[in-house]
Curated annotation (Swiss-Prot):
It catalyses: pyridoxamine 5'-phosphate + O2 + H2O = pyridoxal 5'-phosphate + H2O2 + NH4(+); pyridoxine 5'-phosphate + O2 = pyridoxal 5'-phosphate + H2O2. This is Pyridoxine/pyridoxamine 5'-phosphate oxidase. InterPro entries: Pyridox_Oxase (IPR000659), Pyridox_Oxase_CS (IPR019740), Pyridox_Oxase_N (IPR011576), Pyridoxamine_oxidase_dimer_C (IPR019576), Split_barrel_FMN-bd (IPR012349). Keywords: Flavoprotein, FMN, Oxidoreductase, Pyridoxine biosynthesis. Its cofactor is FMN. GO terms for biological process: pyridoxal phosphate biosynthetic process; pyridoxine biosynthetic process. Substrate binds at residues 10-13, 68, 125, 129, 133, 193-195. One of its GO terms (molecular function) is pyridoxamine phosphate oxidase activity. Binds 1 FMN per subunit. Belongs to the pyridoxamine 5'-phosphate oxidase family. The gene is pdxH. HAMAP family: PdxH. Catalyzes the oxidation of either pyridoxine 5'-phosphate (PNP) or pyridoxamine 5'-phosphate (PMP) into pyridoxal 5'-phosphate (PLP). Its EC number is 1.4.3.5.
Amino acid sequence: MDGVSLADLRLNYTQGGLIEAEVADHPFAQFHIWLQQAIAAELPEPNAMTLSTLSEEGHPVGRMVLLKGLDERGFVFYTNYDSAKGQQLTAHPWAGLVFWWAALERQVRVDGQVEKIDPAESDAYFQSRPRGSQLGAWASPQSRIVGDRQELEDNLARWEKQYENQSIPRPPHWGGFRVIPHRIEFWQGRPSRLHDRLQFNLLDGQWHRQRLAP
């Protein structure tokens, strides 16, 4: 391919390091610190993350989603349960997450088991969404083949009419998943590709931290 050589594209990471003495003892606390710093830096969609699942054939499948909840139980995102990722997570309830904050030269990897969140939590979040997003959850048969864009627009118009001047309930096929981590890795870019990698592993209910070679 013509253009700039991919082999020549590289940055030298110089913003900082990741030293054990400066890292929180609990990975959720450290993640919260980094997420708040990404928000303060006004990065675009700092809660965006790659979600990796397994297909029916056992192949890895990745896509970007948004983190919408975080507490001591895990990382929460919302989707159509009948979508490809929803069906994959139901069949194989394990997932990997990756957060990439390029401007801060940081990455976080999360591996864990997946569960559906309580319907009441999904109801509460759904009611906080903009009305257009609520209607979109009804109108889109996510991951299914549609004839054209007009089919989606017609679906949206139909649901707009049905719920005109009414509150919109959460579709039964839409809700949240929680990734319950057993491993969280924090990566900080460093010069000469000698990056910092600190990994937390959950063993017998306790988090253990170790340094990995880059």
